[in-house]
From Swiss-Prot:
Caeridins show neither neuropeptide activity nor antibiotic activity. The modification Leucine amide is found at residue 15. Signal peptide: none annotated. Expressed by the skin parotoid and/or rostral glands. It comes from the Eukaryota. The lineage of its organism: Eukaryota, Metazoa, Chordata, Craniata, Vertebrata. The keyword Secreted applies. It comes from Ranoidea gilleni (Centralian tree frog). One of its GO terms (biological process) is defense response. One of its GO terms (cellular component) is extracellular region. The keyword Membrane does not apply. It is found in: Secreted. This is Caeridin-2. Disulfide bonds: none annotated.
Length: 15
């Protein structure tokens, strides 16, 4: 879902 995408982006940024 949308939150899954947000989590993926944050994970990619190392946040």
């Amino acid at each position: 879902g949308l939150l899954d995408v947000v989590g993926n982006l944050l994970g990619g940024l190392g946040l």
